[in-house]
């Protein structure tokens, strides 16, 4: 996977975690699990942490989508499959999370059903 994929995924994961206004322990543990599962190098994670300090949601979204739109179709599908699985982690899917997923999937030029199929083929995050 490319640096664009890793960074774009991290930006959108952060945005999804914060979408409902509650970043609970399960979601934060899921961030670490995603980092490990997707083999995101520590230097990329540190770059992400530094770059996102104080960023507002709109800036996170713009940066994440820009990075993901520079990815292959397969990387895009994988990104949104991971995000779909992440939305299930805390046991409740908030309306803001659904809106974010649907808008992001549309902006990336993907079909929702394709994302769902990829997500269902992935193991649960936690």
Task: Name the predicted role of every residue range.
Residues 1-126:
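Small-residue-enriched hydrophobic alpha-helices in membranes
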